[in-house]
């Protein structure tokens, strides 16, 4: 199940559409307050959620899953950014599935490199994502023992869904997601002026 949380300074309406799956819905939100929207079950083929709003909004989505014995788990996923260079780390003992989303109106490419825990590159691939579409692959497709994934490319957002075979085999609910972290250097400008007095 998915719940969308939205904050905006002014009231308006938004369209929520699942990328990779059919269907969209329109919702109203109120200004200067948090609005919670129940999106129901996540479609099986969905890779991302695209939000189009009347005004500037801050949004995140909470995804939950139920397991055996009334056990459940959830993940809070913030809005993704498109950075020219970014990376994500896959915790030891977990498997990662990389999802890349193109919310633009034109096809775009991203070059991705996998690194092991010693910082050595173990594999790379370039993927092309059509406009308004998404692509996904297992981090292990980049090579053995992938500990981190780095990406170069403009206009694409991506992240890694984590999973554990031990959790799945125990029929427990487990859901986790790591968004890409920008690697672009922070810049700051300092103005200096001579004191003429």
Task: Give residue spans per PLM region.
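Conserved functional hotspot residues at active sites or interaction interfaces
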Residues: 1-9, 56-106, 136, 156-197
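Generic structural motif
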Residues: 9-11, 19-21, 42, 54-56, ...
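Short, tandemly repeated low-complexity microdomains enriched for cysteine and small residues
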Residues: 15-20, 25-32, 60-65, 74, ...
């Amino acid at each position: 199940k998915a719940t969308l949380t939205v904050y905006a300074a002014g009231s308006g309406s938004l369209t929520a559409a699942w990328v990779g799956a059919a269907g969209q819905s329109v919702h109203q939100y109120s200004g200067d307050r948090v609005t919670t929207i129940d999106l129901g079950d996540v479609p099986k083929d969905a890779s991302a959620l695209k939000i189009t709003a009347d005004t500037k909004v801050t949004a995140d989505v909470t995804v939950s899953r139920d397991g055996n014995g009334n056990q459940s788990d959830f993940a809070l996923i913030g809005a993704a950014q498109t950075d020219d260079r970014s990376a994500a780390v896959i915790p030891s003992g977990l498997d990662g599935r990389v999802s890349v989303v193109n919310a633009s109106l034109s096809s775009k490419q991203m070059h991705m490199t996998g690194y092991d825990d010693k910082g050595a590159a173990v594999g790379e691939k370039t993927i092309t994502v059509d406009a308004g579409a998404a692509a996904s692959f297992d981090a292990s497709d980049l090579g053995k023992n992938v500990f981190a994934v780095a990406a170069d490319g403009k206009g694409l957002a991506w992240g890694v869904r984590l999973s554990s075979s031990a959790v799945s085999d125990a029929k427990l609910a487990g859901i986790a997601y790591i968004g890409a972290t920008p690697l672009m250097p922070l810049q700051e400008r300092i103005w200096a002026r001579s004191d003429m007095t």
